[in-house]
Amino acid sequence: KGNQNSSDTTSRDTNATSHTYNLGHDFLLNNLISTNTALGYGDSDANDDTGDYENYDFSLRFNFAFPWAYISIGDSLSFIDYKKVDTSIDSGRLRSDFTNTIDLTITKALGDFFPSLDPNRSLFLNLYFERAISESNIRNYDYEADSFSFSVNRSFQIFK
């Protein structure tokens, strides 16, 4: 639950309870290439019924464990059907969205660049790019968005 401020009704009304179910399959082709596929279903119920929706998802991902870097390329398709008409936008049309999200992740050990800083190659640098294209039957909800991120991860073993 998000904002519980009684004076901000927009935030309170868009709070939602969601349940999602996914079925996935991972396939290791060889030591270099693996794939992931997934099917998903979700149901979200907001305090304000105009935010209630069901979504159906399909995703496909290819992973490449090259000796010089780990690269992962994915594509996800989401079909979102809203349950109630949002009268603030269009009083006669039930909203339905289609979103295609493509992403690319590149991971490289810091020790490959600076062996003295990370001799065990357990500190990883990650670059991530995502492009989302969403089309709706109500034009106000169409959008395209790009996202970039950079992160640093450290792996360690808790129990030996």
Which role fits each region the language model picked out?
Residues K1-K160:
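Gram-negative and organellar
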